[in-house]
Every structure is written in C-alpha cells, then in structure tokens.
C-alpha cells in the first residue's frame, strides 16, 4: 500500500502539498523486463534533497501532481506510477545527479513515439523545483519495441535495392541550398550522380518556395536521376524532400515521387513531427520507397549538456518511428571522448543488441530484436582528405555525405563527385588489403590522385 493510500485509510483524506519521495522514490524496486527505463540528468534548485528531486521527475512524468487528489482512490497508483529507483551523483559536476526512473508499460500507447515523449519529456521539463533536466538515455523493452514497424526497409534491403555492397555509400547535398531554379537544380543533381555519387540530397530548407516549387523540382531531379543511371549502369537516388506544412501535402508529395519511379524520399522528422514521420514511414514500406531522415532542429533539443535530451534518445526514437537513413554528424577532428559517444549512438542505430557501456554514454542494454537497422549519415564539413578516417570509423554501413566537399571542387560538380568516388574506392581497397588507414590514409589519397581530377 502506498503512503498516500495509507494516509487516506488511517486518518482520512488530507489536502495540501505532499513530498513526492513518500510515493515515488522506491530504492528497493526491482525493475521489470517490460518497464521503460529512463536516465535523467537532474540539476535541482538549492535546498531540495536528491531523493525528492528524482521522485518529482518520476511523479510529474507519470501519475503524480502536487497534492493528493480524491481520484487517486479510484485507481492503483502502485500499478501505474513511475518510480525513481536509483540516484547517483554525476562525477566532476557539482549539484548534478543521474536519476533512474522506471515506467510501467501500460502508461504508453502502442506504436506511438508521440505518446511516449508526451509523458516522459513533457511538462516535467518546466518544473520549477529543477534548474535543469536532461534525458540522457532510454531503455525500450522488447514488449514495446514489437509494437513499432520501425525503418521502412533497413540496411540489408536497401543494399539489395541499390545492388551496392562492400563499401560506404556516397552522397551530396545540392548547394546553394536556396535560390536555384528547378532546371539548374536538376543539372547539379545530374552532374554529381554522373560523376560517381550514389545519392544527391535536397537541403532540409528546400520544401516548395516561390523560386522552386516542389513538383518542378521532383520532375527535373527524376530526369537527372534516370539519365545518370542510364549512362553509368548504376542505381542512383535523390532524396526528394516531402516535408510539408500538412500531413496531407506531405503524403501527396511522397505519392508523386513514387509515381515518378524514384527510389527514396526525405523527411525532417523533428520539425515535421513524429506522427507525420511514422505515417510516412508506413507508406514507404508499403510502396517500396526508402526514407532518408534529416534532423533539423536537433541542436535546440540536444546541444545543452544539462538540459533537453541527448541525441541518442532522438536516434532511438527515430529507429522506432521509422527511417532508413539519419544524419548522425561526424567525429572527424573531434575529441576521442566525443568520438566514443557518437559511435555509441551509431551502434544504437545499426545493431540488433547493444550492451550497456557508460564510457560511450549507453546507460542501458538495448535489444532491438527484429527491428531493422538505420544507416547513419556522416555529414558536416567533410571532404576527400577525411575519407580514410571516415571509412575506418563508420565502416561500410554508412552514407558519407559531402556538400561543399563535392560542389566546391575547382573544376566543377562532376569532377568533385569523381574525386569523392576515387578517394572512397582507394580507401576501401587499401583497407581490404590490410593497410592501416589511420597511419597511411594521406598516402593512400595521394596515390589515388593520379586517377582523379
């Protein structure tokens, strides 16, 4: 019997502010295989005990409110409440704690990332007893994973569709991202694909603006795509951005892309929303389209170290909602610690089973069972001289996405694409021959230059 229930049974109902820890802090609780587990970084206001802070998070993100209410007696709090079952201080940080919270599975609608986030990262983030709150990680139980379709196709099916194996895929974002006419945009797409890239991409800013309406862009990009395929004998793709102001308009664009025969569409899953994203992912599976996901707006959520949500949580949510690719940044030139953290959530995107590893920021063991994997897209300021490191770090199941690193070539777009492809194939060949790309990468690229513009 909970403390609140005991109070009503023994001395009657008493109104007033209650300490959350009386009901929601349960250090003796043994987590269940069906619980959703969350690790929160809590920065409390001064003078509030850690147990009360952790319990407040559990309460306000599940069944609790600031006082006991009459209707508590009409349900079973012990069955439905979230529980803060462990609290630990954050090493090297003053007045920060990791609070572990377990949520019963019955609190969440099946197959709905929207509902899951509404509860776990909803109003609790504005709770005035906390100076800051960050969701570091989630453990999604198998029972909940199985209620999601996940990625429309997954890594192996994509490779089979493209008939491309044994190397990373190459992409390029068309620049300038705004201002080109549809015909000139299609010309750049053709030159990049003809030069040797596997994919080109709409920038996330490109939807349907006065200078280039979506239907015109789709038509010219499809023409460029099929022309490049015919001339190279390779399957090509262009990420046609279907993101729109309404779900109905988004679906209309996806349907038109399918009717054109293009293999892949794109969605901005954070600005578009998880409900729209899951709807599009279901359509893509049913109709044979691959789905590329951009993460525009992620830094608003994940950039602060003590407030918001870590990108590994957004990555897990995307795998559940559905997407075949997602941008994951790049670790080239970063500190080793950041590299480990990045590769931690890359593994959470690709692998079926990931062990707990706090050194890589993974707070819980995650079993995805049969949910397909997502290909991480390495992008942001990369060029051919990064190719050895990118090949070694991200491996074959990745997309290496260049923008200025292709279109900024002094000889033009097509030579830029050729340079990317030559550098990639040289690095893959050197790796397969047993050469150390970390030590010899620059030499490998220099040797390949004689075959490339």
UniProtKB/Swiss-Prot annotation:
The active site is at residues 175, 294. It comes from the Eukaryota. The modification N6-carboxylysine is found at residue 201. Mg(2+) binds at residues 201, 203-204. Coiled coil: none annotated. Residues 1-2 form a propeptide. Keywords: Acetylation, Calvin cycle, Carbon dioxide fixation, Chloroplast, Disulfide bond, Lyase, Magnesium, Metal-binding, Methylation, Monooxygenase, Oxidoreductase, Photorespiration, Photosynthesis, Plastid. Belongs to the RuBisCO large chain family. Type I subfamily. This is Ribulose bisphosphate carboxylase large chain. The gene is rbcL.
């Amino acid at each position: 019997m909970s403390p609140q229930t005991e109070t009503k049974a023994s001395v009657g109902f008493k109104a007033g502010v209650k300490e959350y820890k009386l009901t929601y802090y349960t250090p003796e609780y043994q987590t269940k295989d069906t619980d959703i587990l969350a690790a929160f970084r809590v920065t409390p206001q001064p003078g509030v005990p850690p147990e009360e802070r952790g319990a407040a998070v559990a309460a306000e993100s599940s069944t609790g409110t600031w006082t006991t209410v009459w209707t508590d007696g009409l349900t079973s709090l012990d069955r439905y409440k979230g529980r803060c079952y462990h609290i630990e201080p954050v090493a090297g940080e003053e007045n920060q704690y990791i609070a572990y919270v377990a949520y019963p599975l019955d609190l969440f609608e099946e197959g709905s990332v929207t509902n899951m986030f509404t509860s776990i990262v909803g109003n609790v983030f504005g709770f005035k007893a906390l100076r800051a709150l960050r969701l570091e990680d989630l453990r999604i139980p198998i029972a909940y994973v199985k209620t999601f379709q996940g990625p429309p196709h997954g890594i192996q099916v994509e490779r089979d569709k493209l008939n491309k194996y044994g190397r990373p895929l190459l992409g390029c974002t068309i620049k300038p991202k705004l201002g080109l006419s549809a015909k000139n945009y299609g010309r750049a797409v053709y030159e990049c694909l003809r030069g040797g890239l596997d994919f080109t991409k709409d920038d996330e800013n490109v939807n349907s603006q006065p200078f280039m309406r979506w239907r015109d862009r789709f038509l010219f990009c499809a023409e460029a795509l099929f022309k490049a395929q015919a001339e190279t004998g390779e399957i090509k793709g262009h990420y046609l951005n279907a993101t729109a102001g309404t779900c109905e308009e988004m679906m209309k664009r996806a349907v038109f892309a399918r009717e054109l025969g293009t293999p892949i569409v794109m969605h901005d899953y954070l600005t578009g929303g998880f409900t729209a994203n899951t709807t599009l992912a279901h359509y893509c599976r049913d109709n044979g389209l691959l789905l590329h996901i951009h993460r525009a707006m992620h830094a608003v959520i994940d950039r602060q170290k003590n407030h918001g949500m870590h990108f590994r949580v957004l990555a897990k949510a995307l795998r559940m909602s559905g997407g075949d690719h997602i941008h994951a940044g790049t670790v080239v030139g970063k500190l080793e610690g950041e590299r480990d953290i990045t590769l931690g959530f890359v593994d959470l995107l690709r692998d079926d089973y990931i062990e707990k590893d706090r050194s890589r920021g993974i707070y819980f063991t995650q079993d995805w069972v049969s949910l397909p994997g997502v290909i991480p897209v390495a992008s942001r300021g990369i060029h051919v001289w990064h190719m050895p490191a990118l090949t070694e770090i991200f491996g074959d199941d990745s997309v290496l996405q260049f923008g200025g690193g292709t279109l900024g070539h002094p000889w033009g777009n097509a030579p830029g694409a050729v340079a990317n492809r030559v550098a990639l194939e040289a690095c893959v060949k050197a790796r397969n021959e047993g050469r150390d790309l970390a030590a010899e990468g620059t030499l490998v690229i220099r040797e390949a230059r004689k075959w490339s513009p």
